[in-house]
From Swiss-Prot:
This is Ubiquitin-conjugating enzyme E2 variant 1A. It comes from Arabidopsis thaliana (Mouse-ear cress). One of its GO terms (cellular component) is UBC13-MMS2 complex. The lineage of its organism: Eukaryota, Viridiplantae, Streptophyta, Embryophyta, Tracheophyta. Residues 11-158 form the UBC core domain. PANTHER family: UBIQUITIN-CONJUGATING ENZYME E2 (PTHR24068).
């Protein structure tokens, strides 16, 4: 039996539980983190991530919040990744905050063994590249989270 045939494919939910456990323990130097967005999400689809802006870049001193959505095909297919915090970066749609797969090779060339941690670390490295590191960022007063794409929440006051 070759090593290819012996490779075990870990089911989606077990894989996500492994990622959750790793995210809760903390990652590397602490400049990226992630976890479940909603503890009641039994399908483990909605995740939140954080990247601390790297030093000596236009992102320094800022905390960037992201949403990652792992559809039913994850980890065979990549999650969708969207910055909640406004950011000016070559691979990010400035209107929606979506990380464009066509501009972020890791998503275009997705492999099953990649993780959400890998995405966050790669985005942080992307912030440090020559074409991103000096990009002017949105003004300070503009750090509020992006509006929910589902529209405003409706509320009643009685």
């Amino acid at each position: 039996m070759s090593s290819e045939e012996a490779k075990v494919v870990v089911p989606r939910n077990f894989r996500l539980l492994e990622e959750l456990e790793r995210g809760e323990k903390g990652i590397g130097d602490g400049t990226v983190s992630y976890g479940m967005d909603d503890a009641d999400d039994i399908y483990m689809q909605s995740w939140t991530g954080t990247i601390l802006g790297p030093p000596n870049t236009a992102y320094e001193g800022k905390i960037f919040q992201l949403k990652l959505f792992c559809g039913k095909e994850y980890p065979e297919s990549p999650p969708t990744v969207r910055f909640q915090t406004r950011i000016n970066m070559a691979c990010v749609n400035p209107e929606t905050g979506v990380v464009e797969p066509s501009l972020f090779p890791m998503l275009t060339n997705w492999r099953r063994e990649y993780t959400m941690e890998d995405i966050l670390v790669k985005l942080k490295k992307e912030m440090m590249t020559s074409h991103n590191r000096k990009l002017a960022q949105p003004p300070e007063g503009n750090e509020e989270a992006r509006a929910d794409p589902k529209g405003p929440a409706k509320c009643c006051v009685m």
